[in-house]
C-alpha cells in the first residue's frame, strides 16, 4: 500500500573504521517505520558499506549526498514513497547536516534535531578538535573566518522556511545543549516555525526520557507530514 510519508534518518559521528551498517540510530528508524513512515537510513560516505572517503572537517559533502537521495525519492526511485511529504531526523553530526540540507531544500516538510551539532562551523571544528585531542578539526586553522561564516547554516537562518523540532539533553557531555538553545532563540527571533524541548538526559536518551522524546517526534511529524 502507500504512498507513505518519507523520513530520512541521519546518523551522528561514529569513527568510520568502527561504523556498522545497523548504526545506533537504527532503533529510531525502526520505531518510525512501524508507525507508517517510509524510513531511509543512509550511511554517510566512507561509513561501510557506503563507498568513498569520509568528510574531513566540514560535513557539506554529506549534505550533498542527502540532497542527491532526496532527488532520487522525488524522481520515483521508491514507488511506495510520497515525494511531496519528506522530513529529516538528524542526531548529532546528522543534525548539523540536516540544517544545511533544509536551507538548500525548502520542499522539506520538517526537521527533527536531536542533540544536534551547531550551525556555526567554527564551533563545530573547535569541538571536534577537543574531542579528538587535536587529531581532527585542523580545518579550524586552515580556513578563514569568512569561509567558515559562509559555510555555516546559521548565517542563512533568515531564509529558512522548514519547521524545526529541536531536542537536547541538559546533561549532554558531547554536544553543548546551549547550541540548541541558541538556535531556538535565533529562530524564534526570526519568527520561524520551531518547537524546542530540553530533557534530563545525555547525548542519547534512555528509558522514560526517550519515550517522551519519541512521542513528541511523532506528534511533530503527524502535524507536518
Predicted regions and their residues:
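Short substrate-entry loop that stabilizes the transition state in hydrolases
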Residues: 2-4, 9-51, 120-121
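Alpha/beta-hydrolase active-site loop
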Residues: 57-77
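Short glycine-enriched nucleophile-adjacent loop
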Residues: 71, 95-106
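Alpha/beta-hydrolase fold nucleophile elbow
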Residues: 79-91
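Short beta-strand/loop motif that positions the catalytic acidic residue
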Residues: 160, 166-168, 172
Amino acid at each position: 500500500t502507500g504512498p507513505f510519508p518519507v523520513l530520512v534518518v541521519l546518523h551522528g559521528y561514529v569513527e568510520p573504521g568502527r561504523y556498522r551498517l545497523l548504526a545506533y540510530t537504527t532503533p529510531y528508524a525502526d520505531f518510525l517505520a512501524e508507525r507508517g513512515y517510509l524510513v531511509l537510513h543512509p550511511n554517510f560516505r566512507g561509513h561501510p558499506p557506503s563507498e568513498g572517503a569520509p568528510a574531513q572537517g566540514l560535513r557539506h559533502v554529506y549534505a550533498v549526498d542527502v540532497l542527491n537521495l532526496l532527488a532520487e525519492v522525488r524522481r520515483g526511485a521508491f514507488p511506495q514513497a510520497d515525494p511531496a511529504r519528506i522530513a529529516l531526523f538528524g542526531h548529532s553530526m546528522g543534525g548539523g547536516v540536516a540544517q544545511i540540507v533544509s536551507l538548500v531544500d525548502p520542499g522539506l516538510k520538517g526537521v527533527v534535531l536531536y542533540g544536534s551539532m551547531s550551525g556555526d562551523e567554527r564551533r563545530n571544528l573547535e569541538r571536534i578538535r577537543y574531542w579528538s585531542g587535536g587529531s581532527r578539526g585542523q580545518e579550524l586553522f586552515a580556513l578563514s573566518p569568512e569561509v567558515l561564516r559562509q559555510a555555516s547554516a546559521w548565517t542563512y537562518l533568515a531564509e529558512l522556511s522548514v519547521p524545526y523540532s529541536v531536542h537536547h539533553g541538559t546533561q549532554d557531555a558531547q554536544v553543548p545543549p546551549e547550541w540548541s538553545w541558541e538556535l531556538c532563540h535565533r529562530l524564534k527571533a526570526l519568527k520561524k516555525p520551531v518547537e524546542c524541548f530540553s530533557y534530563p538526559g545525555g547525548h542519547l536518551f534512555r528509558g522514560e526520557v526517550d519515550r517522551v522524546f519519541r512521542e513528541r517526534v511523532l506528534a511533530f511529524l503527524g502535524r507536518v507530514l
